Structure formats: C-alpha cells, structure tokens
C-alpha cells in the first residue's frame, strides 16, 4: 500500500505542478524531483513550521484512503493555521469540521486544476473559525496526552 500510495502522490504532484508552476514543494517528495517537472526549487527549511506558517494552503496526500486513519499530513498544516487540501482518510469529516480542510475525493480527476482553483479562492480566509476548531480538536482531544487522561478517568474512551 505504501509504494502504491507514494506512486499516486507523485502522479498528483506532477499534475499539480503542471497547473500551478509557482508551487513550493517541501518534504521527501522533493527527492528525485527530476521526475516531477518544472517548479520552484524545494523549500530549504529545517522544520515543518517553517514550511507551513507562511502559506494559506498545503497539499496533503496520505498513502491511501483507509477509514479512521489520518496522519501528520493533515494535522501539521492545521496546527500551523494552514488549510490542508487533503486526500486520504475516507471519513475525515467525522474528525474535523467542514471548512477546516478542502477534501480531494479523486486524485485522478484533474487534481491540478482543483488545487489551482482552490488556491485562488477565499476558502482559507472564510473558514478560520473551522480551522481554529480543528486545531482545538487536535490539541485537546486527539493528541496523546488528552487521550491518556480520558482513558484513565472514563469507562468509554470514545465518548
């Protein structure tokens, strides 16, 4: 699944780069960039915060669409007040409020043009309350410490 997911992510990034040539890339996807196509050089940052804090949007593509599984790919941008353009967890809307992310349903359905349209929109500015709510959920509900605390004081971890 991981290699297949990485292959889908690479194809999606190639399509996005074709539609948004000014995009900045960050992370392991930039290794072997000769296969991606023309784009601004990879961001020379040391931390994820440096990569996300100055941007309105971040494309976040998981390795698959497993229900109830999401990773730092959606969490890290939200914590940095950046709206994720997200493909992954098939029931992500169960965990985060509408507007706190933009979901891509199908990576094969012109993802590059979808991303180009989203970044030209005011979605980020119009949904800051939802982004704040998503941050609060990450910090105070989904994070490890609140989860352990709840497990210690409750009979039902999922209440």
Question: Where are each of the predicted segments found?
Answer:
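Pol beta-like nucleotidyltransferase catalytic core
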Residues: 1-26, 33-60, 67-159
């Amino acid at each position: 699944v991981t290699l297949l997911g990485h292959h889908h992510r690479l194809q999606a990034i190639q399509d996005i780069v074709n539609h948004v040539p000014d995009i900045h890339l960050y992370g392991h996807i930039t290794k072997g960039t000769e296969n991606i196509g023309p784009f601004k050089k990879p961001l020379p940052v040391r931390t994820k915060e440096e990569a996300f804090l100055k941007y309105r949007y971040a494309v976040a593509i998981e390795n698959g669409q497993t229900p109830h599984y999401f990773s730092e790919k959606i969490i890290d941008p939200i914590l940095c007040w950046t709206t994720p353009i997200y493909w992954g967890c098939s029931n992500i809307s169960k965990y985060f409020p509408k507007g706190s992310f933009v979901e891509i349903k199908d990576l094969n359905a012109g993802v590059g043009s979808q991303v180009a349209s989203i970044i030209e929109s005011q979605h980020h500015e119009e949904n800051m309350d939802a982004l704040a709510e998503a941050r609060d959920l990450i910090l105070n509900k989904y994070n490890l410490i609140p989860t352990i605390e709840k497990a210690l004081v409750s009979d039902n971890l999922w209440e």
